[in-house]
Amino acid sequence: MLNIPALILSCIIWSLLWLLFVALCLRHFPWAMAHDYPPDMQQAAALPAPTPAQKRRTTLFAAAVFAILFAFAIATTLLAYAGQPASFATSFCHLWLMGMAWNAVDLLLLDWLLICTLGSPLFLLPNTAHCAGRRNFRFHFIGFLKGCIAMSIISAGLAVVTFGWMHMMR
């Protein structure tokens, strides 16, 4: 049985962490996020190719971010079901719902509201506020569908680790 209060809290915090990391990445490593924008916005941003040092910092940032996000997902799932038997399906559903919650926040709040509708400078590539692609809702919906697949795969991997850890701690 899912621990709904813990799941809701995990979804909110995880989505806020993702939003923070996306904003930081866009400010400090925009070339790492350019593929998440329509082609005309990528062209208008005219981002220079990253130097080897910038690539290294981007890789370190991404590794740290994913380590934090995945550790948070595993830890909150372990805490949500501590002291009670939880099946693999329960672990997977908890993690999958966390992933889908972020994916929905990414589409509805970040992409459609902050980028497409409001044009928030915090989430736009440099020099792209004027681009027609800024209002390309379809582009972001396709990204959402890809995110559903990616989050399903990631959730399965995290569920294997989490479920294994649960059984080792018994």
Task: Label each PLM-derived region with a short phrase.
Residues 1-97, 101-170:
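Juxtamembrane/disordered regions of integral membrane proteins
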